[in-house]
Regions:
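Flexible glycine-rich, low-complexity coil/linker segments exposed to the extracellular/periplasmic environment
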Residues: 1, 43-101, 160-175, 278-303
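Short loop/turn motifs that connect adjacent beta-strands in outer-membrane beta-barrel proteins
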Residues: 11-20, 35, 122-132, 199, ...
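Transmembrane beta-strands of outer-membrane beta-barrel proteins
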Residues: 18-24, 128-136, 202-204, 260-262, ...
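Transmembrane beta-strands of outer-membrane beta-barrel pores
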Residues: 24-32, 121, 137-144, 206-212, ...
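Surface-exposed extracellular loop regions of Gram-negative outer-membrane beta-barrel proteins
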Residues: 30-32, 82, 100-104, 162-163, ...
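C-terminal beta-signal and adjacent terminal beta-strands/loops
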Residues: 44, 331, 384-393, 414-463
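Outer-membrane beta-barrel signature, preferentially recognizing the C-terminal barrel domain
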Residues: 102-109, 181, 210-269, 292-320, ...
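Gram-negative outer-membrane beta-barrel transporters
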Residues: 266-269, 273-278, 285-392, 431
Length: 463
């Protein structure tokens, strides 16, 4: 990555101070993958079963009682070399194929500039208690990529076995794709603050924001379904998801050392990124973008296909309980809760509700309780993350992927040996809560990850 940037700041000599700031940035990210030696794999051709590793216990055995034989790769290969080559036959076609599919490159270049102003509306009275921050960022992004894809009618298994090097070249050598894309966008924003009293502050903001698509979207990729006459490709012209945001917050500060905050937010997201979008039929002729093949096929791709609206509330509270008697005065606590409702339209006349809009967690909460006494301190943290959708496809709604609710408890302990040295003990996921994903409905579990309970000890020092 290469990054160049410069900023300038100037305070206007006016009765009401105004600070101006401007800046420019140029950034280039190059991601290159080379598989010159190729990835390799082998097939066992021996006549007898190989010894298994009895020390491996799998989740399936714990849940069902079945004992499935398990092997570790280090039992058969060391330093990328087979321990006993006579027992294995290499898939040479796979190795040669990976030299093409594993070699690719993508470059993203961003050129941007911004200007902003900050100050107060007045010097005295009501306007002196009102501040502002406003500005705009203009950004241009260009991307280029190249890579190999498989030709429509690949080599047969017999051809791959007889001459794997030539078969791989036949499948890939003449189907290198070079893609380009880009966009230019501006992102203005305005933020206001007002102190109603010494302990009550209000905030109001209108802003625009964006989220760039992943760079993998710009790499050449073609997945062909001959039965359905479709080809799924990447889209190098994907725009960023943009959002117009309204945020309003009230903060109340109280003694001893406490804060209560209530916030409301509303976001309108445009150019929402959706996969499996039908972008039309591929034409005929050598200039159809696919060397003259796939005419009549339906092109499916990832596209900026609609809008989403997100709004909700945030509540937070934190306080030190120094007014309590005795040992309890070392207590402090905090809590926050977020509730989100979403809906979106990704093409057609059907609006999708919260359960179908990717990237948002409808319900989330955190609570913590801390206690400090002399050199000893401890903290208990509870985290709740509600169920949410992870993957959405307009072409296969029944296979949308969701994550189940997750509740975790973490405990932290610390002892101050001296002001510059602390000993710590942190226990994560105290209840060993698993992460569970499912497809379509909760009974169709896709995967479960048991993270386990992690205990870590540390020494922190300042010298």
């Amino acid at each position: 990555m290469r990054d160049l940037r410069g900023n300038a700041r100037y305070v206007l000599p006016t009765p009401i101070p105004v600070t101006l700031k401007t800046g420019v940035q140029w950034r280039e990210i190059l991601v290159q993958q080379l598989q010159l030696g190729g990835s390799r794999r082998w097939t066992y051709v021996g006549t007898g079963a190989r010894p298994t590793d009895p020390g491996l216990t799998m989740f399936d055995e714990i849940k069902t009682g079945r004992r499935t034989p398990q092997w570790e790769a280090t039992m058969f290969i060391r330093d990328r070399t087979l321990i006993n080559p006579t027992l294995w036959s290499e898939d040479v076609f796979y190795r040669e194929q990976q030299k093409y599919t594993g070699t690719k490159e993508v470059t993203e270049t961003v050129s941007a500039a911004f200007v902003m102003a900050e100050g107060k509306l007045g010097r005295q009275g009501l306007f002196a208690r009102t501040g502002y921050l406003t500005g705009v960022r203009i950004e241009g992004t260009a991307n280029e990529s190249w890579g190999w894809v498989r030709q429509r009618f690949g080599s047969t298994a017999a051809e791959q076995q007889a001459d794997p090097v030539r078969a791989a070249a036949r499948d890939y050598a003449n189907t290198r794709r070079n893609l380009k894309g880009g966009y230019t966008k501006s992102f203005p924003s305005t933020h206001l603050t007002h102190d109603f009293t010494s302990s009550l502050r209000g905030r109001l903001a209108w802003s625009t924001s964006f989220g760039r698509p992943g760079m993998s979207n710009w790499l050449p990729n073609e997945s062909v379904n001959e039965a359905n006459q479709t080809i799924t490709v990447n889209n190098p012209d994907l725009l960023p998801q943009t959002a117009t945001n309204w945020d309003a917050t009230l903060d109340y500060y109280f003694e001893p050392v406490g804060n209560l905050s209530v916030g409301w937010f509303h976001k309108t997201i445009k150019d929402y990124i959706v996969s499996g979008v039908n972008t039309g039929m591929i034409g005929s002729g050598n200039d159809n973008g696919y060397n003259g093949v796939y005419d009549g096929f339906t092109r499916l791709t990832t596209s900026n296909a609609g809008t989403a609206v997100v709004q909700g509330w945030e509540f937070s509270y934190q306080q030190q309980f120094t007014f309590l008697p005795g040992l309890l005065k070392g207590l402090s606590g905090s809590a926050n809760y977020t509730a989100i409702e979403t809906h979106g339209n990704f093409g057609g006349n059907i609006n999708s509700e919260t359960s179908k809009v990717v990237g948002f967690i409808p319900r989330a909460a955190n609570m913590s309780l801390s206690w400090r006494y002399k050199r000893f301190s401890t903290r208990l943290l509870y985290n709740y993350t509600g169920s949410y959708i992870v993957e959405y496809s307009a072409a296969a709604v029944g296979f949308n992927r969701y994550r189940m609710p997750l509740k975790t408890i973490n405990l932290g302990l610390a002892y101050m040996v001296r002001p510059a040295v602390n000993i710590t003990c942190d226990i994560s996921n105290l209840t060993n809560a698993p992460q569970v994903w499912y497809r379509g409905f909760t009974e169709r579990m896709q995967s479960t990850i048991i993270n386990g309970i992690a205990v870590s000890f540390g020494v922190n020092g300042r010298f």
